[in-house]
């Protein structure tokens, strides 16, 4: 029997543009994703690739220019301070110092495999873990 995983956080077409006219900067460009209950997610990328901007949109700290965030199957509603506080009780991000997070001499798949194995992922084949 196949295990049915529930989507807890989903983004559709998330885009963030800062500035306007010739000073316009496209920080996040139409990102789609689904995060599932019980899943640990790490967003990695080069400096300036939009990781922090995406995280701030997911947390509701900044609004997307386009796109929607869905939480527990419904369009996220954080229009009031009270609703935002309630949302924040259910979601968390951990921003890390990049120099203390990863060993630059290890390949990223080896670093992520260590994390997966620590969380009980030893039962999955290597290919499934790093896909």
Which residues are covered by each model-predicted region?
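ABC ATPase NBD coupling module
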Residues: 76-92, 118
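A short, flexible loop at the N-terminus of ABC-type nucleotide-binding domains that lies
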Residues: 5-8, 17-30, 37, 80-83, ...
């Amino acid at each position: 029997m196949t295990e049915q995983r529930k989507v807890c956080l989903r983004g559709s077409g998330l885009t963030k543009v800062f500035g306007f006219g010739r000073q316009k900067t496209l920080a996040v460009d139409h990102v789609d994703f689904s995060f599932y209950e019980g899943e640990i997610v790490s967003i990695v990328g080069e400096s300036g690739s939009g990781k922090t901007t995406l995280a701030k949109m997911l947390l509701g700290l900044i609004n997307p220019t386009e796109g929607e965030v869905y939480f527990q199957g419904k369009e996220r509603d954080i229009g009031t301070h009270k609703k935002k506080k309630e949302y924040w009780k259910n979601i968390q991000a951990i921003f890390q110092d990049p120099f203390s997070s990863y060993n630059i001499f290890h390949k990223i798949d080896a670093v992520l495999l260590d994390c997966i194995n620590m969380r009980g992922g030893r039962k999955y084949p290597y290919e499934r873990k790093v896909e």
